Protein backbone atom coordinates (compact mmCIF):
# COMPACT_ATOMS: atom_id res chain seq x y z
CA UNK A 1 0.00 0.00 0.00
CA UNK A 2 1.29 3.45 -0.86
CA UNK A 3 0.78 6.48 1.37
CA UNK A 4 1.00 9.39 -1.09
CA UNK A 5 0.92 12.24 1.41
CA UNK A 6 3.77 14.07 3.13
CA UNK A 7 1.92 14.43 6.43
CA UNK A 8 1.51 11.75 9.09
CA UNK A 9 -1.82 10.30 10.17
CA UNK A 10 -2.38 7.18 8.10
CA UNK A 11 -5.93 5.99 8.88
CA UNK A 12 -6.00 3.21 11.47
CA UNK A 13 -7.95 0.89 9.17
CA UNK A 14 -5.06 0.89 6.66
CA UNK A 15 -2.99 -1.12 9.15
CA UNK A 16 -3.29 -4.81 9.89
CA UNK A 17 -4.48 -5.11 13.48
CA UNK A 18 -4.60 -7.58 16.36
CA UNK A 19 -6.88 -6.96 19.34
CA UNK A 20 -4.15 -8.09 21.73
CA UNK A 21 -1.54 -5.68 20.34
CA UNK A 22 -1.87 -1.96 21.18
CA UNK A 23 -1.87 0.68 18.46
CA UNK A 24 -1.13 4.39 18.60
CA UNK A 25 -4.26 5.82 16.98
CA UNK A 26 -3.95 8.06 13.92
CA UNK A 27 -4.64 11.46 15.54
CA UNK A 28 -2.34 10.76 18.49
CA UNK A 29 0.27 9.32 16.13
CA UNK A 30 0.19 12.46 13.96
CA UNK A 31 0.73 14.67 17.02
CA UNK A 32 3.45 12.45 18.48
CA UNK A 33 5.32 12.38 15.17
CA UNK A 34 5.08 16.17 14.90
CA UNK A 35 6.54 16.47 18.42
CA UNK A 36 9.43 14.20 17.36
CA UNK A 37 10.30 16.67 14.56
CA UNK A 38 11.70 13.96 12.31
CA UNK A 39 14.10 14.86 9.50
CA UNK A 40 15.15 12.95 6.40
CA UNK A 41 18.03 10.63 7.28
CA UNK A 42 17.27 10.48 11.02
CA UNK A 43 17.89 7.39 13.15
CA UNK A 44 14.66 6.65 15.04
CA UNK A 45 13.91 4.22 17.89
CA UNK A 46 10.31 3.13 18.56
CA UNK A 47 10.16 1.46 21.98
CA UNK A 48 7.04 -0.71 22.29
CA UNK A 49 6.29 -0.74 18.57
CA UNK A 50 3.03 -2.72 18.92
CA UNK A 51 1.28 -2.80 15.54
CA UNK A 52 4.08 -0.79 13.96
CA UNK A 53 1.97 2.26 13.11
CA UNK A 54 4.58 4.71 14.47
CA UNK A 55 7.45 2.62 13.06
CA UNK A 56 5.90 2.68 9.58
CA UNK A 57 5.09 6.39 9.59
CA UNK A 58 8.50 7.32 10.99
CA UNK A 59 10.09 5.23 8.25
CA UNK A 60 8.15 7.12 5.59
CA UNK A 61 9.37 10.41 7.12
CA UNK A 62 13.08 9.52 7.40
CA UNK A 63 13.17 8.17 3.85
CA UNK A 64 15.70 5.77 2.39
CA UNK A 65 18.65 7.55 4.04
CA UNK A 66 17.24 7.06 7.55
CA UNK A 67 16.55 4.01 9.65
CA UNK A 68 13.87 3.10 12.19
CA UNK A 69 14.39 0.52 14.92
CA UNK A 70 11.24 -1.05 16.37
CA UNK A 71 11.52 -2.83 19.72
CA UNK A 72 8.84 -4.89 21.45
CA UNK A 73 8.84 -7.67 24.04
CA UNK A 74 6.02 -9.54 22.25
CA UNK A 75 6.80 -11.76 19.26
CA UNK A 76 3.26 -11.12 17.95
CA UNK A 77 3.96 -7.37 17.92
CA UNK A 78 7.25 -7.80 16.06
CA UNK A 79 5.55 -9.99 13.45
CA UNK A 80 2.64 -7.56 13.09
CA UNK A 81 5.01 -4.61 12.69
CA UNK A 82 6.89 -6.57 10.03
CA UNK A 83 3.68 -7.27 8.10
CA UNK A 84 2.63 -3.61 8.25
CA UNK A 85 6.11 -2.48 7.15
CA UNK A 86 5.88 -4.87 4.19
CA UNK A 87 2.40 -3.59 3.38
CA UNK A 88 3.68 0.00 3.16
CA UNK A 89 6.92 -0.95 1.40
CA UNK A 90 9.27 0.32 4.12
CA UNK A 91 10.71 -2.92 5.51
CA UNK A 92 14.12 -2.14 3.95
CA UNK A 93 14.84 0.72 6.35
CA UNK A 94 13.34 -0.88 9.47
CA UNK A 95 15.17 -3.05 12.01
CA UNK A 96 12.95 -5.08 14.35
CA UNK A 97 14.23 -6.36 17.69
CA UNK A 98 12.36 -8.61 20.12
CA UNK A 99 13.25 -7.80 23.71
CA UNK A 100 12.15 -5.95 26.81
CA UNK A 101 13.14 -2.38 27.49
CA UNK A 102 15.23 -1.08 29.08
CA UNK A 103 17.59 -4.09 29.02
CA UNK A 104 17.37 -4.69 25.26
CA UNK A 105 18.27 -1.06 24.51
CA UNK A 106 21.86 -1.56 25.65
CA UNK A 107 22.35 -4.31 23.05
CA UNK A 108 21.65 -1.93 20.15
CA UNK A 109 24.90 -0.57 18.77
CA UNK A 110 23.44 2.74 17.55
CA UNK A 111 22.84 6.30 18.68
CA UNK A 112 19.47 7.81 17.82
CA UNK A 113 18.23 11.24 16.74
CA UNK A 114 14.68 10.60 17.96
CA UNK A 115 13.13 8.12 20.40
CA UNK A 116 9.43 7.37 20.75
CA UNK A 117 8.24 5.54 23.87
CA UNK A 118 4.73 4.16 23.49
CA UNK A 119 2.42 2.54 25.97
CA UNK A 120 2.56 2.56 29.73
CA UNK A 121 5.51 0.53 30.92
CA UNK A 122 6.02 0.16 34.66
CA UNK A 123 9.72 0.67 33.90
CA UNK A 124 9.26 4.13 32.38
CA UNK A 125 11.96 5.71 34.58
CA UNK A 126 14.49 3.06 33.60
CA UNK A 127 13.53 3.32 29.92
CA UNK A 128 14.00 7.10 29.99
CA UNK A 129 17.38 6.67 31.70
CA UNK A 130 18.47 4.18 29.03
CA UNK A 131 17.18 6.51 26.31
CA UNK A 132 19.45 9.27 27.63
CA UNK A 133 22.44 6.99 27.05
CA UNK A 134 21.57 6.13 23.45
CA UNK A 135 20.20 9.42 22.14
CA UNK A 136 22.43 11.91 20.36
CA UNK A 137 23.00 15.43 21.61
CA UNK A 138 20.16 17.52 20.23
CA UNK A 139 17.91 14.47 20.09
CA UNK A 140 14.25 14.41 21.10
CA UNK A 141 12.27 11.90 23.15
CA UNK A 142 8.48 11.70 22.93
CA UNK A 143 6.36 9.57 25.26
CA UNK A 144 2.67 8.66 24.95
CA UNK A 145 1.00 7.90 28.27
CA UNK A 146 -2.49 7.03 29.44
CA UNK A 147 -1.97 6.76 33.21
CA UNK A 148 -1.30 9.78 35.43
CA UNK A 149 1.30 7.72 37.28
CA UNK A 150 3.20 7.20 34.02
CA UNK A 151 3.07 10.95 33.32
CA UNK A 152 4.33 11.77 36.81
CA UNK A 153 7.14 9.21 36.66
CA UNK A 154 8.15 10.28 33.14
CA UNK A 155 8.32 14.01 33.93
CA UNK A 156 10.21 13.35 37.16
CA UNK A 157 12.73 11.09 35.41
CA UNK A 158 13.24 13.47 32.49
CA UNK A 159 13.85 16.43 34.81
CA UNK A 160 16.24 14.49 37.04
CA UNK A 161 18.26 13.09 34.12
CA UNK A 162 18.63 16.45 32.40
CA UNK A 163 16.20 16.55 29.48
CA UNK A 164 15.39 20.15 28.57
CA UNK A 165 12.41 21.99 27.06
CA UNK A 166 9.97 19.54 28.61
CA UNK A 167 6.44 19.80 27.31
CA UNK A 168 3.28 17.91 28.20
CA UNK A 169 0.08 17.97 26.18
CA UNK A 170 -3.19 16.27 27.05
CA UNK A 171 -5.17 15.18 24.00
CA UNK A 172 -8.82 14.16 24.03
CA UNK A 173 -10.16 12.87 20.73
CA UNK A 174 -13.85 12.34 19.95
CA UNK A 175 -14.88 10.49 16.79
CA UNK A 176 -18.26 10.75 15.10
CA UNK A 177 -20.43 7.63 15.14
CA UNK A 178 -23.67 7.26 13.20
CA UNK A 179 -26.75 6.47 15.26
CA UNK A 180 -30.40 5.98 14.24
CA UNK A 181 -31.13 9.68 14.73
CA UNK A 182 -27.85 11.36 13.79
CA UNK A 183 -24.17 11.48 14.65
CA UNK A 184 -22.89 11.12 18.21
CA UNK A 185 -19.37 12.03 19.28
CA UNK A 186 -17.66 9.12 21.04
CA UNK A 187 -14.78 10.22 23.24
CA UNK A 188 -11.62 8.12 23.42
CA UNK A 189 -9.35 7.87 26.44
CA UNK A 190 -7.29 11.01 27.10
CA UNK A 191 -3.64 10.64 26.06
CA UNK A 192 -0.70 12.60 27.39
CA UNK A 193 2.16 13.41 25.01
CA UNK A 194 5.41 14.27 26.79
CA UNK A 195 8.47 15.55 24.96
CA UNK A 196 11.97 16.71 25.82
CA UNK A 197 15.41 17.29 24.33
CA UNK A 198 18.95 16.27 25.17
CA UNK A 199 21.05 19.42 24.78
From Swiss-Prot:
Residues that bind S-adenosyl-L-methionine: 24, 48-52, 72, 101
Keyword tags: Cobalamin biosynthesis, Methyltransferase, S-adenosyl-L-methionine, Transferase
Classification via Pfam families: Methyltransf_31
Annotated disulfide bonds: none
Catalysed reactions, as listed in the record: Co-precorrin-6B + S-adenosyl-L-methionine = Co-precorrin-7 + S-adenosyl-L-homocysteine + CO2
Keyword hit for S-adenosyl-L-methionine: yes
Record GO terms (molecular function): cobalt-precorrin-6B C5-methyltransferase activity; protein methyltransferase activity
Database matches in InterPro entries: CbiT (IPR023475), Cbl_synth_MTase_CbiT (IPR014008), Cobalamin_biosynth_MTase (IPR050714), Methyltranfer_dom (IPR025714), SAM-dependent_MTases_sf (IPR029063)
EC code(s) of this entry: 2.1.1.196
Biochemical pathway: Cofactor biosynthesis; adenosylcobalamin biosynthesis; cob(II)yrinate a,c-diamide from sirohydrochlorin (anaerobic route): step 8/10
Gene Ontology BP annotations: anaerobic cobalamin biosynthetic process; methylation
Stored Gene3D superfamilies: Vaccinia Virus protein VP39
Family statement drawn from the similarity comment of this UniProt entry: Belongs to the methyltransferase superfamily. Archaeal-type CbiT family.
Protein's name according to its UniProt entry: Probable cobalt-precorrin-6B C(15)-methyltransferase (decarboxylating)
Record lineage: Archaea, Thermoproteota, Thermoprotei, Sulfolobales, Sulfolobaceae
Amino acid sequence: MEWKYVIPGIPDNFFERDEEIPMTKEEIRALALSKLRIRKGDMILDIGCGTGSVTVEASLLVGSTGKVYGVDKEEKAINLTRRNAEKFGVLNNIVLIKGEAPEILFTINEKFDRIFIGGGSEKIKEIISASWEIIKKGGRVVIDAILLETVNNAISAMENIGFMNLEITEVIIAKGMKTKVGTAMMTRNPIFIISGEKQ
